[in-house]
Amino acid sequence: MPKSEIHPKWYPDAKVICNGEVVMTTGSTKPELHVDVWSGNHPFFTGTQKILDTEGRVDRFMKKYGMGSADSATSQETKEAKESDK
């Protein structure tokens, strides 16, 4: 016989909330689950090429490894300035 009162409370109709909307219900140990991305707005499932850039991480990576960035004109000016200094 399993011990009583050691298991968490089970919510069979837990709401999954994304951007303030209830997107689905599922079973969970919490009554509400707040998510940033789910299959309804994920680029892989929607077929869109949207970069979810949180706190400029993509731009920092692009600048660090010289792969261009959103401000490609600025990076071109910087390269030209470095070449003229030589």
Curated annotation (Swiss-Prot):
Tree of life domain: Bacteria
Keywords in alphabetical order: Ribonucleoprotein, Ribosomal protein, RNA-binding, rRNA-binding
Keyword RNA-binding: yes
InterPro entries: Ribosomal_bL28/bL31-like_sf, Ribosomal_bL31, Ribosomal_bL31_A, Ribosomal_bL31_sf
Region annotated Disordered, chain positions: 66-86
Keyword check for Ribosomal protein: yes
Pfam family, one: Ribosomal_L31
Biological process per Gene Ontology, one example term: translation
GO MF annotation terms: rRNA binding; structural constituent of ribosome
GO cellular component, as recorded: ribonucleoprotein complex; ribosome
Comp. bias (Basic and acidic residues): 77-86
Function per UniProt: Binds the 23S rRNA.
Family according to the record: Belongs to the bacterial ribosomal protein bL31 family. Type A subfamily.
Subunit structure: Part of the 50S ribosomal subunit.
Official protein name in the record: Large ribosomal subunit protein bL31
Name of the gene this protein is made from: rpmE
